[in-house]
Amino acid sequence: MFEFRKQAMRQRRQLITRVVVAVLFVLLCFGILVNRLWVLQVERYQGLSERAERNRITLVPITPRRGDIVDRNGVVLARSHRDYTLEMVRGQVGDIPKMLEQLEQIIHLSPLELRRFKRRLGSSNRFASVLLKSNLTDDEAATFAAHSYKFKGVSLKARWVREYPEGESAAHVIGYVGRISERDQEQLEEKGLEGNYRGTEVIGKKGIEASYEERLHGKTGWEEVEIAASGKPVRVLKRTDPIPGDNLRLSLDMGLQKLVEGIYNDPKNPQRGALVAIDPRNGQVLAYVSAPSYDPNLFVDGIDVENWRRLSDSPDHPLIDRPIYGTFPIGSTYKPFVALAALTLGVRDPNAKIPDPGYFEYGGQRFRNAGGAAYGPTNMHKAIVVSSDTYFFSLGPLIGVDALHDFSQQFGFGKKTGIDLMHEKKGILPSREWKKNAFKNPAQQKWIPGDTISVSVGQGYNSLTITQLAQATATLAANGVYTKPHLVNWIENPVLKTVEQTVSEPEYKVDVAQEHIDLVKSALSDVNATGTARRIFAGAGYESAGKTGTAQVFSLKGTKYKAEALNKRLHDHALYMGFAPVDNPRIAVALIVENGGWGSSVAAPIARKVFDYWLAPERANIPEYIPSFDDEEQQEEISPDLEIPENIPANPDDNAPGHTPEILASIDMNRNGRDDVHNDEAGAL
């Protein structure tokens, strides 16, 4: 009995202990829970509340409309328009092949579109929006909208698409836009501009599109969108409208531009080359031709392999921007500047007559006139008019290469002109220092007299751009006043309705006497009146000045030049520089026809047509552009990536019969792959 009671008491104590432990455990858990609730509801309330709000609200970028580019008369060269696309988020589509099969029943997908889609799909993450089809017609967009509920993860979107209405015309000036690359993204981040490019797929790659990117792009807008638990947008809480990019009005005249392009691109005799025309009074570039050209529209959505190979493998190199990137010996067009150097440095009396037997002998070597011509006693005026190589051969050693370098550079040779395009080359204006740095072999580093003699007629190591020659010609026409050339005349803000004129002020005046300039101008005028270009300019209703030039492509080594016996690519380059009218120059021109032969017979006729067009009496009645926004329409900016209906149907069956369901565009902060071939510098696959 006693043992039984003792055992009962022991069990009771154990029960009490267990109850106490259980109670303490419950209290401990409750304490932990209360503490956690305190932390969440009090201590961390603000931060967690903001995080929850961020999870509920998504920022959707609204891409701004890129600014237009027009010529001086308002001809549209680049513009943006709306384009419908189909895009897919891989993570939201279960069976992609089945989806494509169903989609093809209502919208045609070409084999090329499918190949590109699969290629993009392979390089994207599961949450990225991948382009499936672009350039949908209105009918195709409406058809998909009516069946959109069948295609989960596929959305219809609108985007801004760049268009170049003039095609190949002025392509090297305008340039093109292309998909934002990793390098572009890094550069945007370095400048702190990546936020302004959210939702933007393209960026300026070449030409004006690149050099004025920040003005053309505009400012990205934003929408704060409330997102349902299903991930669908519910409503827009706040909207900041995008600011469209500025419009650019160029100094180019497309009538003149197309006239020159038509000459170079003559189907019967297409030519390679470049031409730049500048107004010497203000630096406005009136024409800028690089032939052959290309269609910038090919690059907007990414150029395909076939077209890329056609352009990049062409022996005519249409992608090269010849006026600023191609460098050439400029031949006799350099002689007027050599003459000015001699006059300024006082190395020869311009009236002194130098014997010209058809060659100049120096150090036991004979340097011959082109064509073996002999001009007899020749002064400076005559030497320019008849283009006596012998006369200028003899000037070279007297001036010296370094002095000639320093003087010529004042006119724009051997340095960047500052034209508002990227990737301009400095070219080669040789000097002793240049040669020392250009060659590793000590024997080749030494400057010899023969080098100076060749340079003095625009040959030898001279390798300059046509833009530099045009700028030097404009500076000479302006009596030594150097004004930086520019392509953009006006920048128009469509929102503020303001305009900004990009006037180039003269940078400096070349240190040369007016009497020396007048002497050279007089000789250049006689070149067109009685000299090497007299036949071309006969009957012109204005007085012009100029200089023809012929630059050797390879050395003849003492043999006679016979064009008919040479491969076309070995023919001499034909050049011309000039300005008109002589008394008050309004246009200065420099041009080259690659492997064209003689400048007087090939290049000068092009200049004559340019002068005739620009100085035609009827052009005197064309008024100068005066900015006005009286007829400007306000352009409402809407999000190309988001359409939110007022009432969201729970499913397609909730709609009335025949009702087209609303489109809920998926919200994707990632950029879309656009092309299977893209290059940053028009150079690499």
PLM-predicted stretches and their roles:
Residues D631-E632:
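Cytosolic-side transmembrane-helix boundaries in multi-pass membrane proteins
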Residues V593-E594:
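Ligand-site clamp/hinge motif
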Residues M1-V305, T327, D402-G412, T452, ...:
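Periplasmic/cell-envelope proteins involved in peptidoglycan metabolism and beta-lactam response
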Residues F2-K6, R13, E226-R239, L252, ...:
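Beta-lactam-recognizing serine transpeptidase/beta-lactamase-like catalytic domain environment
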